[in-house]
């Protein structure tokens, strides 16, 4: 599967959001161009962790750069925790028999009590719409 197309706007937002992520943070990643854009700006960070339902090629690049180590995670330290993967052949080759990758069902990866075991969790997601009037949008 081809990665989502990252636009100039995605890159500007991604650059700003990446400034909010600190060394040692544990990341939950959503689907789409925005999480991938943010990941591209994290190459100067240290000891990031991954505890997420899904991850993509951007995580592989950060592991290979030594940015993602999962060393500061409390739940399965040294391991990336995920339910599924979405990306290119490079991603699937990376996760195949990789001892750093641990697969769990969604009732583990998305369980608030388990997520809370990791310090400094940061969720990176996109949104489709926001109502500025604070009313609900029914789609």
Give each language-model segment a name.
Residues 119-121:
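Short loop/turn motifs at secondary-structure junctions and domain boundaries
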Residues 107:
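Active-site-adjacent helical/loop segments in soluble small-molecule enzymes
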Residues 125:
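Catalytic, metal-anchored helix/loop core of enzyme active sites in primary metabolism
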Residues 1-104, 114, 129-133:
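Metallocofactor- and cofactor-centric catalytic cores in central/energy metabolism, strongly enriched
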Residues 137-139:
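Conserved small/polar residues in nucleotide/adenosyl-binding loops
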